Amino acid sequence: MMTLKEALSLASDDIKKLRDDLTLKIKESKIGAYVEQLTSTDISQSGVGIPIAIKDNINVKNWEITCSSNILKGYISPYNATVIEKLEKAGLSPFGRTNMDEFAMGSSTESSCYGKTLNPIDNEKVPGGSSGGSAAAVAGGIAIAALGTDTGGSIRQPAAYCGCVGMKPTYGRVSRYGITAYSSSLDQCGPITQNVEDAAILYDIISGYDPMDSTSANINYEAVTPKLNSDKKLTIAVIDNFVSQASPAIQKGFQKAVNALEEGGHKIIHKNMLDTQKIVSTYYIVATAEASANLARFDGVRFGNRKGESGLKDMYVQTKSQGFGHEVQKRIMLGSFVLSSGYYDAYYIKAQKVRHLIKDEYSKIFSEADLILSPVAPTTAPKFGSFKTSLEMYLSDIYTISVNLAGLPAISLPVDKDEDGMPIGLQFIANAYEEQTLFDGALSLEKAINYKK
């Protein structure tokens, strides 16, 4: 499959041929339900730029945007998200929609109203979530690259499960304008690509200050791609209590990466973080509280397909009960509970205090280290139906959610395979706004490992 870097050097006739070839691949693909979303888009109207697949919660003008939810089916976006404007300005163009967990709430892309997405490496395994369609599209060879969103690992975990590279920028580095909010203080948009250099290129294209987003960081920005340096020697921290909780396959892949980094001249130091159970509790209190507020607008009046005809209350009840899936309803209820009178101080305020402790923990580590190396998930991609309870699914994010709570940048890349041939992904975490160091370290590990798909 052609890389993004290679595609950027193509002439217009070659780009047209590439788009035709990818369109054919989409129509013939059996990877999963995200194909329905991709082919439902009128690709001929997408322009002539290099094709990039787009997650179904990012607004593209005149395209349907549903967030993979019944409540938004048929809604046509009247405008482009800032990241889409930046893509088009750089000569790239939206190529098609990719499937996702409903409103980005999930870790397996099973909660979509379009049905589940299959992992292209093993169709019995989940592709991860919530950006599972984007990762599957890249891994399956029907997209050069894709955009996803990451609220608690939703770019990095699918990339790890599918053997791709997935990058979450520093909070505020990429505009959220035009991206449907799940948790406003945690959401970030980022690239899913075939390799680290492509991720750096796409990151450079979509990042930068945007006055349309009040959370956008108004600071100087320098492109990372021209300065990529895989030879830079770094101090890399290993979080021992994270690694010890991972499966034997993940631990084996982790040690392989550590050995490669040490052989490359990088210094490895050992650290510990807060208990992962506390991190999970904090994340789901903060995320669901913000989700309950953000999704209140989908009421059948402002947004959402209206249901119920016997009065205002009936309309609200029927619209939301028929429009939202089970997982979304559950998270809205949990968020409403922790924000309610009598529980706000007991849960939400305490969660915000723990969030600051998490930031402090990272700050202490980065006073001694340039990067942190961590697993992305406790296991490789599980089979469909493996998560018997919501808690089991939530715990699959134990290594990624603290990064969002602290607003830090991170990148996932494949380093090995388990005995079933499934990818093992690890993540580098950097201090805020240190994306250059993040990409340098990731490129160094990628070259040292030389992962074969």
From Swiss-Prot:
Keyword entries, A-Z: ATP-binding, Ligase, Nucleotide-binding, Protein biosynthesis
SUPFAM superfamilies cross-referenced by the UniProt entry: Amidase signature (AS) enzymes
Stored PANTHER family: GLUTAMYL-TRNA(GLN) AMIDOTRANSFERASE SUBUNIT A, TRANSAMIDASE
Record GO biological process: translation
EC numbers: 6.3.5.7
Active site residues per record: 55, 130, 154
Assembly: Heterotrimer of A, B and C subunits.
Catalysed reaction, written as an equation: L-glutamyl-tRNA(Gln) + L-glutamine + ATP + H2O = L-glutaminyl-tRNA(Gln) + L-glutamate + ADP + phosphate + H(+)
GO MF assignments: ATP binding; glutaminyl-tRNA synthase (glutamine-hydrolyzing) activity
Protein name: Glutamyl-tRNA(Gln) amidotransferase subunit A
Pfam family, one: Amidase
Top-level taxonomic group: Bacteria
Keyword Nucleotide-binding carried by entry: yes
Record organism: Aliarcobacter butzleri (strain RM4018) (Arcobacter butzleri)
First and last residue of the signal peptide: none
Uppermost EC category: ligase
CC annotations in GO: glutamyl-tRNA(Gln) amidotransferase complex
UniProt similarity note: Belongs to the amidase family. GatA subfamily.
Record keyword Hydrolase present: no
